[in-house]
Amino acid sequence: GSSGLISMTRV
């Protein structure tokens, strides 16, 4: 679920 959000925050 939050994987997508973490991906963006990990830029």
Swiss-Prot record:
GO terms for biological process: neuropeptide signaling pathway. This is Periviscerokinin-3. GO terms for cellular component: extracellular region. Mediates visceral muscle contractile activity (myotropic activity). Belongs to the periviscerokinin family. The modification Valine amide is found at V11. It comes from Therea petiveriana. Signal peptide: none annotated.
